């Protein structure tokens, strides 16, 4: 096999026909400015082709289920292995997906509990023993005299299939009837089952009535049932209505005192995704949705007449509305009127308003469309009325008023009481999953068993320990297995999948990772690099898109893509060992690695306006009654190891409180006693890396408001006025000026059954999105299509005499986006580019000097050169008197902040406290701070 991966003529996106040779079975870092073409090379070329070749080798039937990728624009790739991509975007939002299920540790735990678990009665907690035939018969005979019942043999429990053999075996054994999914059938008739649905089948062994002379017959029937279903029997007690309760018995396990039988323990019983083990109330989700009174009443100072209830249908409650007269009548009984502020409602009155007035009836005149209707009716309460509407009309609108609460039956534990009664080492499966990874490893290592159980558990424990160690090696020791996958950050989810891949121990694979260091503190970087090297040493090629200096220096080979971004990028600037790249004069990466270039430390720090945002008693997630002050008018960095509580403090508490109180948004802040100092601010703006739009129609021009100015400009031209065109004519989102053949998209989607959908340029407008009449309207000789195809840099020159347009374009240029097209589809922008479009939009607005900007890891996806530009923008915002709060791990950005709030000292349970505050120099001197230790070196204080 070739010792290199050879790429020739790569032309995907902005790649300029590049040729590149990458060594196989090495740790290779692809780096370069944001938008330089790194992802195009790594994911759209190498991964796409590696995955495509693998999928192409499968049958056409298999390809239907495997989403095939386009063949990338590349002349040749040699030495390519099957590719696995580990990026940030594929985090499961399924509430059933947890850290335990994603890493497969939960599967091994289920096996462990099924094989060596000790069952306990869920009522009394006593250890459960096996039942004998005589004990089972005695229990049945204890039923009241005259009770009619059936003896059933449970042969299939919630299993897919047609189960023809089960029916055939039952016929051969002389049985006459079966119960399938609760329905009775004669075995003489043909029973056709859907093989894709789970079925439960019981053979009816006997029908009996409790009398004094049935012991012998009952004993024979029970014995027959036990024999057929491997030690289990069900007794269906039939009452006169045909309904009845079921009693389950097992020769395996049962609590004699409470008559509770356990089936034989098997792994699927411990799965919350299987109906056998899942909590019957919440079906294994662990929580339930209900209407939140807190969300219905965001502002308690309002009255019912003034819109105190935030839901449509209840916002305007007056005497001449439909619901108003009824609520006013209820108010007479409970001491409120439509003009009583909700904050003054008694507990009883609020309960009646929300959950109803019981059986009381009210005679009222209700109005609809100005017409009155006399009615005598009960009042169900606003919550119940909304629930009824949700059932009848679907609940999309009402979702914003719904909250998730722990299931009242399982209390969020997802499993049935019976399953939670099984323990290993004194803990049930939920309790062990609630431990942090670090504590769970210590617990697993301390387990001791008898001789036989030790033999059974040995291999299972070995797999569990290995996977827990892999999670610790990627810096995730603070997580627990019951954490839902949807609540993980992109970096955490990526590192979990990385740990899972190491656990699978594949060799000869091409792994492509997208910035695995995101969200990771410098302290844990060494662990991550060790993990990447471990993956390489198994015999794999590891290609990492990364900007982290430590990772680059630890790599075997660096590829620097550039030299600039967008149209100025797409070339290979340098390729070689870290030492070779350092020496390359053309490489910006080399300049930063060698120290020729560096981000400067400010000569002085802002002291701020003298006012503070004072947060008191923050207790969200792992925060431990935290008190912290944020100086206004400064650039503040919030730091700490992963899981220390940064996002809980800033995103869940601070941002949501500010958005609610300053922006009047409907948000629900995390647990905090108080936040004061809001009177010194006028609004809060969160700038993240989420896309600026989800469709190809969205672009930087539409997001920044530039497109409105451009359309107005074209509508004001002589040509447009002569034809009677207004600004709407120049929109590709509405009929009129757009090309109707492609509906303004510029491309058409051709569906291909066994191949990926193909997008072809519209043959009518040739990809220009507008019809010919619209394109005939020119400004300075350019059509609207020509303007949207210009780069921001070209646009500044073109619109030189138009201050409003030029200002918006200039801010895009200032944030380093001079290379992107004015009308470039938002779906093609990277996270870093999308964030800078948002920053540019803010910079182009007139500053009030009283705004607070909140950014969560803004350096994600940014090269050191881009970080330098980002810092300049943030400093510019702070220079205007605004407050900038940034959650960050990047030391280059942290060292330029005016003030640092360092949380920790560890992640998870070991975090949530204030470790250090002050200027970077002050935090660097704090011995307890991990951030301070790394800052000392950056600031040259060590």
Where in this protein do the model-derived segments appear?
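Conserved phosphate-binding elements of NTP-dependent enzyme cores
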Residues: 1-942
């Amino acid at each position: 096999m070739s010792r290199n991966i050879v790429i020739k003529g790569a032309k995907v996106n902005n790649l300029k026909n590049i040729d590149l040779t990458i060594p196989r079975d090495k740790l290779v870092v692809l780096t370069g400015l944001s938008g330089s073409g790194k992802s195009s090379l790594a994911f759209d070329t190498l991964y796409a082709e590696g995955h495509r070749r693998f999928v192409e080798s499968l049958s056409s039937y298999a390809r239907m289920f495997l989403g095939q990728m386009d063949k990338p624009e590349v002349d040749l790739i040699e030495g390519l292995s099957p590719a696995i991509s580990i990026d940030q975007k594929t985090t499961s939002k399924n509430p059933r997906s947890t850290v335990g299920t994603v890493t497969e540790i939960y599967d091994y735990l289920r096996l462990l509990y099924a094989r060596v678990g000790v069952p306990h009665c869920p009522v009394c907690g006593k250890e459960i023993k096996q039942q004998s035939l005589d004990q089972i018969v005695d229990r049945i005979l204890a039923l009241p005299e005259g009770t009619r019942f059936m003896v059933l043999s449970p042969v299939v429990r919630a299993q897919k299939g047609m189960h023809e053999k089960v029916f055939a075996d039952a016929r051969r054994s002389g049985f006459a009837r079966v119960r399938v999914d609760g329905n009775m059938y004669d075995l003489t008739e043909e029973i056709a089952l859907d093989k894709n649905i789970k079925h439960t089948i019981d053979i009816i062994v006997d029908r009996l009535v409790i009398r004094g002379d049935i012991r012998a017959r009952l004993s024979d029937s029970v014995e027959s049932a036990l024999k057929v279903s491997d030690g289990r029997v069900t007794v269906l007690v039939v009452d006169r209505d045909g309904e009845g309760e079921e009693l389950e018995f097992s020769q395996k396990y049962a609590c004699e005192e409470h008559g509770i039988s356990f089936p034989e323990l098997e792994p699927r019983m411990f799965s919350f995704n299987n109906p056998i083990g899942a909590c019957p109330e919440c079906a294994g989700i662990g929580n339930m949705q209900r209407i939140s009174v807190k969300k219905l009443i965001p502002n308690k100072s309002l009255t019912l007449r003034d819109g105190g209830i935030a839901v449509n249908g209840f916002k305007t409650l007056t005497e001449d509305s439909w619901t108003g007269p009824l609520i006013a009548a209820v108010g007479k009984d409970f001491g409120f009127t439509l003009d009583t502020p909700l904050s003054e409602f008694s507990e009883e009155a609020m309960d009646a308003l929300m959950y109803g007035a019981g059986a009381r009836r009210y005679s009222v005149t209700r109005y609809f469309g100005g017409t009155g209707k006399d009615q005598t009716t009960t009042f169900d309460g606003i919550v119940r009325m909304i629930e009824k509407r949700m059932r009848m009309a679907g609940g999309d609108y009402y979702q914003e008023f719904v909250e998730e609460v722990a299931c009242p039956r399982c209390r969020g534990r997802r499993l049935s009481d019976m399953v939670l009664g099984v323990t290993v080492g004194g803990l049930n499966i939920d309790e062990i999953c609630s431990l942090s990874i670090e504590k769970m490893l210590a617990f697993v290592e301390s387990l001791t068993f008898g001789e036989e159980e030790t033999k059974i558990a040995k291999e299972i424990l070995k797999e569990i320990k290995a996977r827990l160690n892999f999670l610790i090696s990627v810096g995730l020791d603070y997580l627990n297995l019951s954490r839902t996958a949807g609540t993980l950050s992109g970096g955490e989810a990526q590192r979990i999948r990385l740990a899972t891949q190491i656990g699978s121990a594949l060799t000869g694979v091409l792994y492509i990772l997208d910035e695995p260091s995101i969200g990771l503190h410098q302290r844990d970087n060494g662990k991550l690099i060790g993990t990447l090297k471990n993956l390489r040493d198994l015999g794999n090629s590891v290609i990492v898109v990364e900007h982290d200096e430590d990772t680059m220096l630890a790599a075997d080979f660096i590829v620097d893509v550039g030299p600039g971004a967008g149209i100025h990028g797409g070339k290979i600037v340098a390729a070689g060992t870290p030492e070779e790249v350092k020496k390359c004069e053309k490489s910006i990466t080399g300049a930063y690695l060698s120290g020729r270039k560096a981000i400067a430390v400010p000569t002085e720090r802002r002291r701020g306006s003298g006012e503070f945002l004072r947060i008191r008693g923050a207790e969200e997630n792992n925060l431990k009654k935290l008190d912290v002050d944020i100086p206004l008018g400064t650039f503040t960095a919030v730091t700490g190891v992963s899981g220390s509580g940064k996002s809980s403090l800033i995103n869940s508490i601070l941002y949501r409180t500010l958005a609610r109180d300053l922006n009047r948004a409907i948000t629900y802040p995390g647990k905090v006693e108080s936040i004061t100092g809001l009177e010194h601010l006028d609004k809060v703006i969160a700038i993240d890396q989420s896309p600026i739009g989800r469709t190809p129609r969205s672009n930087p021009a539409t997001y920044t408001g530039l497109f409105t100015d451009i359309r107005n400009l074209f509508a004001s031209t002589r040509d447009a006025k002569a034809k009677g065109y207004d600004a709407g004519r120049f929109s590709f989102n509405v009929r009129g000026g757009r090309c109707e053949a492609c509906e303004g998209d510029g491309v058409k989607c051709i569906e291909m059954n066994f191949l990926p959908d193909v997008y072809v340029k519209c043959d009518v407008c040739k990809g220009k999105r507008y019809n010919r009449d619209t394109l005939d309207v020119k400004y300075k000789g350019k059509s609207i299509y020509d303007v949207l195809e210009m780069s921001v840099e070209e646009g500044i020159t073109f619109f030189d005499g138009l201050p409003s347009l030029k200002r918006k374009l200039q801010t895009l240029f200032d944030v380093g986006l001079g290379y992107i097209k004015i009308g470039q589809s938002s779906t093609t922008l990277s996270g870093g580019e999308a964030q800078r479009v948002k920053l540019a939009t803010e910079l182009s607005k007139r500053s009030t000097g009283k705004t607070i900007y909140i950014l969560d890891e803004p350096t994600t996806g940014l090269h050191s050169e881009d970080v330098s530009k980002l810092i300049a923008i943030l400093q510019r915002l702070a220079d205007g008197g605004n407050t900038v709060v940034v959650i960050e791990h990047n030391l280059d950005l942290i060292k330029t902040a005016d003030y640092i709030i360092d949380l920790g000292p560890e992640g998870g349970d070991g975090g949530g406290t204030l470790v250090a505050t002050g200027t970077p120099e002050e935090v660097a001197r704090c011995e307890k701070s991990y951030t301070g230790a790394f800052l000392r070196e950056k600031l040259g204080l060590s």
